[in-house]
UniProtKB/Swiss-Prot annotation:
It catalyses: 5-(methylsulfanyl)-alpha-D-ribose 1-phosphate = 5-(methylsulfanyl)-D-ribulose 1-phosphate. Pathway: Amino-acid biosynthesis; L-methionine biosynthesis via salvage pathway; L-methionine from S-methyl-5-thio-alpha-D-ribose 1-phosphate: step 1/6. The active site is at D280. This is Methylthioribose-1-phosphate isomerase. It comes from Eremothecium gossypii (strain ATCC 10895 / CBS 109.51 / FGSC 9923 / NRRL Y-1056). Keywords: Amino-acid biosynthesis, Cytoplasm, Isomerase, Methionine biosynthesis, Nucleus. GO terms for cellular component: cytoplasm; nucleus. The gene is MRI1.
Length: 403
């Protein structure tokens, strides 16, 4: 059974339901949170109960849809004093304020901004609340279905690109890859972005296939046999979520600390040939904002001559942002650094969460959620349409994504 970060029951467009997996409780407890309003969507995004740029956008859109559904219910209208439903224009004014509120939940991930821009266009084109609700339903369904399909295409594109490159340079045998944060089914509608590429590599290895031709591989054909996910402090998305997904899919993997990556590359019994990372926003020149620690990983990979790939959908590329210096970088609460939360060790019965302080309460903390990797350290950007590489001058040309 595949992992589901978002459960969207869509049989009847007037009676949809949305639940999101509380990822702060993983990997020990699987508990879903119902989403009924925009405020619910804001809360789970802001608290990082749901995370990953594609999933954030999807949950944001679904929270608008379910709020519209409730507004169509007269029992609910009576308690929603902040909406004026005397006219569609009055409703639209309030909805725009709600969308602006939702956008403030996570400012770095551009997918949410792009999705809410689409919602505003639907709001402008509709003439009634019920029509807007129906169009939101169609858009939400399309967004989820396209995300999964695009993720599979991205995964295959990334896997084929790496295997082709290894074959071209004459490499044969087993190899390993690195990844950071969580970019799999838990960060998307399904399959994943960077972790999707790793899934595709593992499928090639299991099937004994080379890329791009689906023929039986020789015993020495390149094949990925191991993954090294970084723990990804301070929220530990690598140790809590990516490790959980790799175990779920039975992909051979060994969890490593963020600080041990250079030594792991240096001593790995299986050569590490690539790092696959996701993105929360890609600037027009290819500079990439991703989970804090990504820049450090890129620098280490450059030192050791390891290919560094960014895997992200077209919606993550921001044509209005020229370079990484223009990307707003979210800073999180200092206590998210000072305190670690997890399952209580040695507890019997159902796992219980416990929080442990790991730094003095009055110690100043700098806790950025993201860093920005300059395009100079990125070998390729993998999208659902194709893989982008740099020209002879070392620059990406992403212009076709904006036409």
């Amino acid at each position: 059974m595949s992992l589901q970060a978002i459960q969207f029951q869509r049989g009847d467009k007037s009676q949809v339901s949305v639940r999101v997996l509380d990822q702060l409780l993983l990997p020990y407890v699987s508990r879903y949170i119902p989403i009924q309003t925009v405020d619910d969507g804001f809360a789970v995004i802001r608290s990082m109960q749901v995370r990953g740029a594609p999933a954030i956008a999807i949950v944001g859109v679904l929270s608008v849809l379910v709020e519209c559904q409730l507004l169509c219910n007269e029992d609910f209208v009576a308690v929603q004093a902040f909406y004026d439903l005397s006219s569609y224009a009055a409703f639209g004014r309030t909805m725009r304020m709600r969308l602006a509120h939702l956008l403030g939940s996570r400012p770095t991930a551009v997918n949410l901004s792009h999705a809410l821009r689409d919602v505003e266009r639907l709001l402008d084109s509709a003439t009634s609340l019920s029509q807007f609700r129906d169009r939101m339903y169609d858009y939400a369904c399309e967004l989820l279905d396209m995300d999964v399909a695009n993720n599979v295409r991205m995964g295959d594109n990334g896997a084929r690109f790496l295997l082709d490159a290894l074959i071209a340079e004459g490499f044969d045998g087993s190899f390993a890859v690195l990844t950071i944060c969580n970019t799999g089914s838990l960060a998307t509608a399904g399959y994943g972005t960077a972790l999707g590429a790793i899934r595709s590599l593992w499928q090639h290895a299991e099937a004994g296939l080379t890329a791009p031709k689906k023929q039986k591989a020789s015993a020495c054909a390149p094949r990925m046999t191991h993954v090294f996910p970084l723990e990804t402090r301070p929220y530990n998305q690598g140790s809590r979520l990516t490790a959980y997904e790799l175990l779920h899919d039975a992909i051979p993997a060994t969890l490593i600390t963020d600080s041990s990556v250079a030594y792991r590359i240096q001593t790995s019994p299986v050569p590490i040939k690539a790092a696959f990372v996701g993105a929360d926003r890609i600037a027009r020149n290819g500079d990439t904002a991703n989970k804090i620690g990504t820049l450090q990983l890129a620098l280490v990979c450059r030192h050791f001559g390891i290919r560094f790939f960014v895997v992200a959908p077209r919606s993550t590329v921001d044509g209005t942002t020229a370079a990484g210096t223009d990307i707003p970088v979210e800073e999180r609460c200092p206590d998210e650094f000072r305190v670690v939360t997890g399952a209580a060790a040695g507890a019997t019965g159902d796992p219980t969460t416990a929080s442990v302080a790991i730094a003095p309460r009055d110690m100043p903390v700098w806790n950025p959620a993201f860093d920005v990797t300059p395009h100079a350290y990125i070998d390729a950007i993998v999208t659902e349409t194709r893989v982008f590489t740099k020209d002879a001058a070392g620059n990406f040309d992403l212009d076709e994504l904006f036409t």
